[in-house]
């Protein structure tokens, strides 16, 4: 029996694989705009440097003022938390100088995700080697640390967690999705037979979590690493996980090195076959591949989507964040033109003269016919 967590999750993981799905195909449900960089060295007012990041590992949400807000780590020092805001849906961004992150939380806690808290405000989840911690804000701008950890790696039988994205379920509970970042570069970069899974835990208050049995995403994409899950609720009400897949770390395959994938579920446990989001950007420092890392997907009030992804690695493109807008694809159906209307045929009435002995009759018709015993004259 799975026991409830007080602050830390207890180990209660049973491997019960979900049905293996086919490898991901490109998403066609949405049309994705050409990605554009929204966190840049210029915006942050710093020079491009291999040791300083403009921004990576983002979380986006609509704050209490109705602005699109993004929190990420970057700048100098590179693990400091920053926030940018946009009042026009992401077309223009500015650094929020009034943003306040708690100083009493370790800088090593990264990969933030944000969800609306049950009693108002916002709760953010961050992780490091020890587990997943949480922070709280009433407005999305000023944050305070919450005591303890929400989940630990040992609760899942893992060495290190990543992700921590949370979605609200249809029944009012919350589900958190975490990835396996144990020995990340060794396993995902060198061991070609590796496959990392995405797991989940459930909560009623976002503070105490129960580990769910099995895994949510696993071998569906073959021997690749499924990393840094974020969660969202799509316009249809389905629960979604968005995560990035490493095709082959540190190797050029002239296609894509990493990209965002997402999968949907009606209950947050059993997911559809993952779809690959085609929005990526090129990184010349790694050859010709397209890249998208640490993906975050959110639904705007107008039901359009915003995808945020990091470009890791050295410049000139690296260590910046791009955005792509997703709009529901318009389904077209072929129609057969109706046949042209035809005018009714015109009926011509004619007359003939019919005789029978001395009797004569004029008959009209189309065509006219003489009565019985009469002959046409």
What are these regions, as identified by a protein language model?
Residues 350-356:
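A short beta-strand micro-motif
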């Amino acid at each position: 029996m799975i026991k409830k967590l007080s602050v830390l999750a207890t180990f209660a993981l049973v491997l019960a694989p979900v049905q293996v799905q086919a490898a991901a195909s490109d998403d066609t449900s949405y049309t994705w705009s050409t990605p554009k960089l929204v966190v840049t060295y210029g915006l942050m007012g710093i020079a491009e440097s291999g040791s300083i990041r403009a921004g990576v590992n983002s979380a986006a949400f609509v704050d209490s003022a109705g602005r699109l807000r993004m929190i990420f780590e970057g700048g100098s020092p590179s693990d400091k938390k920053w926030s940018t805001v946009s009042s026009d849906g992401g077309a223009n961004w500015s650094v929020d100088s009034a943003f306040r992150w708690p100083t009493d939380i370790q800088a090593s806690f990264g990969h933030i995700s944000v969800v609306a808290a049950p009693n108002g405000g916002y709760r953010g989840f961050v992780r490091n080697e020890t587990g997943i911690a949480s922070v709280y804000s009433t407005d999305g701008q000023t944050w305070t640390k919450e005591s303890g950890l929400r989940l630990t790696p040992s609760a899942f039988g893992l060495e290190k967690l990543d992700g921590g994205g949370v979605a609200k379920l249809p029944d009012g509970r919350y589900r958190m999705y975490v990835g396996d970042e144990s020995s990340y570069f060794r396993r995902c970069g060198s061991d070609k037979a590796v496959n990392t899974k995405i797991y989940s835990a459930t909560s009623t208050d976002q503070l105490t979590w129960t580990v769910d049995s099995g895994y949510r995403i696993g071998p569906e994409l073959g021997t690749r690493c499924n990393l840094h899950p974020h969660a969202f609720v799509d316009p249809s009400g389905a629960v979604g996980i968005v995560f990035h897949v490493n095709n082959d770390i540190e190797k050029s395959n002239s296609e894509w090195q990493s990209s965002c994938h997402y999968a949907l579920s009606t209950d947050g446990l059993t997911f559809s076959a993952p779809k690959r989001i085609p929005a990526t950007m090129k990184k010349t420092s790694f050859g010709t591949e397209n890249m998208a890392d640490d993906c975050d997907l959110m639904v705007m009030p107008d039901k359009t989507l915003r995808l945020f992804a990091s470009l890791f690695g050295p410049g000139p493109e690296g260590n910046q964040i791009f955005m792509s807008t997703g709009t529901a694809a318009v389904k077209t159906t072929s129609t057969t033109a109706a046949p042209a209307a035809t005018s009714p045929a015109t009926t011509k009435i004619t007359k003939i003269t019919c005789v029978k002995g001395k009797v004569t009759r004029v008959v009209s018709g189309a065509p006219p016919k003489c009565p019985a015993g009469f002959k046409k004259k």
